[in-house]
């Protein structure tokens, strides 16, 4: 924990990915401490899928964790995590200024959304690239790539309703 805080003090990070293991290190307490000092840095827990880890995570305080993902061996999950966080940060401005659409994925199963999000992002990015090729110049191409639908993940019904109401006019 002290080592991570020292690194954060000396360097600029835009994302923290923690991987829990079954030793005595408490990444959840460390995440809470990091969030106190660096509240704007997203913290993601990337965990192997197992019953033991799932039970442990179910009993942890996840208030400092932005997302929990299950590592299923698909490297595209890392891109999906980055894009999901970018979408979370950019959606309010992009929907208000450019009218970007929102895709709302509602799912409470970590294992399922860890599997589905990489496929969803791959599809959306491929569609955006095809759409951008139709642009007349570089500026239009850039605007069309930025204008791809943003994906929002809701893990509870209440979160889904809140996101829906926030972006209902898009």
Task: List the model feature ranges, each with a label.
Residues 1, 44-112, 153-155:
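Output/docking surface of receiver
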Residues 1-5, 13-40, 47-58, 65, ...:
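Conserved phosphotransfer microenvironments
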Residues 38, 98-99, 146:
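Short, flexible coil/linker segments at domain boundaries that flank nucleotide/cofactor-interacting
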Residues 88-94, 124-143, 167-168:
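Alpha-helix termini
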């Amino acid at each position: 924990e002290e080592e991570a805080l020292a690194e954060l003090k000396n360097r600029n990070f835009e994302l923290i990915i923690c991987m829990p293991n079954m030793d005595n290190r408490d990444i959840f307490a460390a995440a809470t401490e990091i969030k106190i000092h660096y509240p704007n840095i997203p913290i993601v827990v990337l965990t192997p899928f197992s019953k033991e880890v799932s039970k442990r995570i179910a009993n942890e305080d996840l208030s400092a964790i932005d997302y929990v993902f299950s590592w299923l061996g698909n490297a595209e999950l890392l891109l999906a995590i980055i894009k999901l966080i970018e979408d979370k940060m950019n959606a309010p401005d992009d929907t208000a200024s450019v009218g970007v659409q929102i895709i709302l994925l509602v799912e409470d199963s970590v294992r399922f959304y860890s599997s589905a999000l990489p496929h969803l992002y791959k599809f959306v990015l491929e569609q955006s690239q095809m759409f951008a090729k139709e642009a007349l110049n570089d500026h239009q191409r850039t605007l069309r790539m930025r204008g791809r639908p943003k994906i929002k993940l809701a893990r509870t019904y209440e979160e889904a309703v809140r996101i829906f109401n926030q972006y209902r006019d898009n």
